[in-house]
Amino acid sequence: MKLNVNLPDHPYDVIIENGALANIGNWVSSLWKKQKIVLISDNHVNGLYGQKVVDQLEKSGFEVETFEFPEGEASKNLLTAEKAWNFCAEFGLTRSDGIIALGGGVTGDLAGFVASTYMRGIHFLQIPTSLTAQVDSSIGGKTGINSKMAKNMIGTFTQPDGVLIDPEVLKTLGQREFCEGLGEVIKCALIADKDLWNLLTDLSAKDLLENFAKIEEIIYRSCEVKRKVVVDDELDNGVRLYLNFGHTIGHAVENTAGYGKVMHGEAVAIGMVQISKIAEKKGLMPLGITDEIRKMVKKYGLPDDYQPWDEALLFKALTHDKKARGTIIKTVIVPEIGTAKINEVTFEEMKEYLKK
């Protein structure tokens, strides 16, 4: 399966294919001339796939070094980025060379940020190995690192030269890590694909883990939602905000819990349920939709709430949300399953939203 992210200034393909990792040398050769490559990966994923990828790239004529960092959201910071910049410089990476992200969302965000800022920008490719990264963060060009104030506070819009998705790598994920990615899949269904919602209604996490043909279909449909939105609004000024359904409260939960304690897809699931509950009470979403969303996230092993729910800490994190404009924050609601809408809320109203 192939999707084309047909942006006017930087079009690229997303390849979705079981077993694609075994053909990585040919794929990279079709996109880049023979050059130096820094492979960026965390210690866990690098241990699983790193040497195989390096061997194939070297066999195809590339000169490769690997920058490995400690697994987890806590590594997505300026210190790790600086270490990566220095690593690239010591290897002699120039603007004609490139960076490949091999890993989940943390790796993709970090590697993309490093590539977009090293020497004011060099080429990079995405090879996502988590479900969250495959269906969401590897596509669209958002890169970033966290600060203590907010998630992804420092970042750029920089499109990759290509994305290679191999669903078979998901077999190495634990159940929690796999289900976490379904938070973003459920979000895609809610904002833009009712047929995907119906498919998720008919399936279960167990079905998906046992049937990789279904996984491939779900990845494709989720990527297509992301592709359409990114092509319509590359820089996040309009409809791309729909992709943030559940993320306003979700990012605040991640921040207040401590990065990595609540996984991103889990936080998105919590955020979707909580913002829907508020919007339903205010008549902005239909009666009963929150229960439908809650039932779906729980069916796929995701949380619908977070404790301790500290309104003051959550509000402080929300004030640094990237969707804030002055004292107004743009939240996303779902008027009906398969559609989305922007709802502008003042900070004072958001304080009320956070009260339980």
Curated annotation (Swiss-Prot):
Note the superkingdom of the native organism.
Answer: Bacteria
Q: Give the UniProt record's GO annotations in the biological process aspect.
A: amino acid biosynthetic process; aromatic amino acid family biosynthetic process; chorismate biosynthetic process
Cofactor(s) essential for the protein = Co(2+); Zn(2+); NAD(+)
Its family?
Belongs to the sugar phosphate cyclases superfamily. Dehydroquinate synthase family.
| Residues that, per the record, bind NAD(+) | 71-76, 105-109, 129-130, 142, 151
Listed Pfam families: DHQ_synthase, DHQS_C
Compartments annotated for it: namely: Cytoplasm
Q: In which pathway does it act?
A: Metabolic intermediate biosynthesis; chorismate biosynthesis; chorismate from D-erythrose 4-phosphate and phosphoenolpyruvate: step 2/7
Q: What is the lineage of its organism?
A: Bacteria, Bacillati, Bacillota, Bacilli, Lactobacillales
User: Per the UniProt record, which EC number(s) apply here?
Assistant: 4.2.3.4
Catalysed reaction(s) here are: 7-phospho-2-dehydro-3-deoxy-D-arabino-heptonate = 3-dehydroquinate + phosphate
* Gene assigned in the entry: aroB
Q: Identify the species of origin.
A: Lactococcus lactis subsp. cremoris (strain MG1363)
The record's keywords, sorted A to Z, are: Amino-acid biosynthesis, Aromatic amino acid biosynthesis, Cobalt, Cytoplasm, Lyase, Metal-binding, NAD, Nucleotide-binding, Zinc
* CDD domains in alphabetical order: DHQS
Provide the protein name: 3-dehydroquinate synthase
